[in-house]
Amino acid sequence: MSALLVLSTAPSKEVATLLAKTLVEQHLAACVSIQEGITSFFEWQGEMAQESEVLLLIKTKESLFEALKTTLCALHPYEVPEIIALEISKGHLPYLHWIDSVTKDPV
């Protein structure tokens, strides 16, 4: 099992909570941590932008990434949501096994 940490941002805690609950309820993520108080700076449509955002730290397995990404894109209010996956190369083995045990591959 190859575990991933997926990073995504949302415009509010309410949106982040909806995304997190959906991913966990659908067994696409073992855990989603929400961090408020993020400030993002980026260029959008030729203009410099600064926005307050909420960061989602999504723990899942690699085999679920495409389904997770599809679900995030379908529910996300952003035109181009941030969805970045980082492979977890090392970790506490019982935690990594837990990720595998509570997530379910699509049928």
Question: Which functions belong to the PLM regions below?
Answer:
Residues 1-107:
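Positively charged, small/polar-rich N-terminal and surface patches that mediate targeting and assembly
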